Amino acid sequence: MSGWDDYIKLLFGKSPAIKRAAIIGSDGSVWARSGDANAFRATEVELKRFAALFNDINSVPGTGADLEEIHYIVPRVEEKLIFGKKEQTGFFAAKTNQAIVIAMYEGDNAQSASVRAGVEYIAQYLASSGY
């Protein structure tokens, strides 16, 4: 297990609603991803496109975002955060200087708050560590 995998485990511990997760570089390269029954299945092409969304984050609500071959509407973005939703599933992604933390979740809007908090916690820690 790499050190990056430990951050994935920590992220899962932040919310039971998190089903899959990854940490990618700002270029879309995979640093760590959940596996086995909770395998994060986004392709290399998807992740490169997804990482590029942060270059023009304010346009993302108009176009949405694709992960794991699913198109999500994006009702909200913030400076370094994208929130995607489709029915009872969604994702939060937070960008640091070098990394993007992504958590895919299942559940209602009330559960999404803990997912967001977990993603932001990991992202803030990575940013404070120089990533």
UniProtKB/Swiss-Prot annotation:
| A GO cellular component annotation in the UniProt record | cytoskeleton
Keywords on record: Actin-binding, Cytoplasm, Cytoskeleton
Which GO terms fall under molecular function for this chain's record? actin monomer binding
Q: In which tissues is it expressed?
A: Expressed in the intestinal wall, the spermatheca, and the pharynx.
One record GO biological process: muscle thin filament assembly
InterPro entries with a match to the protein in the record: PFN, PFN_euk, PFN_sf
In which domain of life is the source organism classified? Answer: Eukaryota
List locations, semicolon-separated: Cytoplasm, Cytoskeleton
Q: Name the Pfam families for this protein.
A: Profilin
Keyword Cytoplasm, does the record have it? yes
* Summary of subunit composition and partner proteins: Occurs in many kinds of cells as a complex with monomeric actin in a 1:1 ratio.
Similarity comment = Belongs to the profilin family.
According to its UniProt entry, the function of this protein is described as: Binds to actin and affects the structure of the cytoskeleton. At high concentrations, profilin prevents the polymerization of actin, whereas it enhances it at low concentrations. By binding to PIP2, it inhibits the formation of IP3 and DG.
**What protein name is recorded for this chain?**
Profilin-2
- What is the gene name? pfn-2
